From Swiss-Prot:
CDD domains, alphabetized: KOW_RPL14
Pfam families xrefs: KOW
Domain of life, source organism: Archaea
Lineage: Archaea, Methanobacteriati, Methanobacteriota, Thermococci, Thermococcales
Official protein name in the record: Large ribosomal subunit protein eL14
Length: 82
């Protein structure tokens, strides 16, 4: 299983957004991360428990705490769609 780190693409496996992809933007502590869908899907920028995420092998190069615009640009550059 890939590591939980900034820029990692993940699939939400619990809650009403289950099945949707998101990008990990920041690591809050050992249990929570900040995720976003960068306006490309219905996932809003929010705190999420890492137990509710399944990390994927894809990763984009973004700084910690990147804005949605930076995330969207990095996704387009890498050719990854959410």
């Amino acid at each position: 299983m890939p590591a939980i780190d900034v820029g990692r693409i993940a699939v939400i496996i619990a809650g009403r957004r289950a099945g949707q992809k998101c990008v990990i933007v920041d690591i809050i502590d050992k249990n929570f991360v900040l995720v976003t869908g960068a306006g490309l899907n219905k996932v809003k920028r929010r705190r999420m428990n890492i137990k509710h995420l399944e990390p994927l092998p894809e990763k984009i190069d973004i700084p910690r705490g990147a804005s949605d615009e930076e995330v969207k640009a990095a996704l387009e550059k890498a050719g990854i769609s959410l």
